[in-house]
C-alpha cells in the first residue's frame, strides 16, 4: 500500500471560484468537505491532485501554481496518483476514507484555464466520494487502500 501525506486542503464557498487553502477541514460522510461549493450528494464530492504533478507543470511551464489554484480540494504528496484506480480508497489521517469514483473529467473552459492556461483535473484529477468522514489536517498521512 502506497503512503504519502496531505500537502494541502482547499475549499471555496461556491463553484467557479479559486479555492483557498485551510489548515484543517471537516469531511462529512456522503457529502464532501464542509464549506466547499462542490460538496453534495454526487460522485465528485472531493477532488485530489498529485503535488508532484503540479511541481512538474511549474518547472515545464515556468509557472508558480500553488494550493487551490487548480480547483482541487486536496493535494497529496508522496503517492503516484496515476497508479490509483477507480474503486480504490484513500485513508487520510486516522479516520477519513474517500473512494475514487472517477479519474479525470470533461475539459471545458473554466476559471482555472482562463487564469493559468492549463488544467490538470480533466486529465489527472481523482474524484472521490466520502465513505467515512472526520477532521483532516495539512500534513496528515495518506494511504491507498486497494
Give the residues covered by each predicted segment.
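Metal-cofactor-dependent catalytic cores
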Residues: 1-146
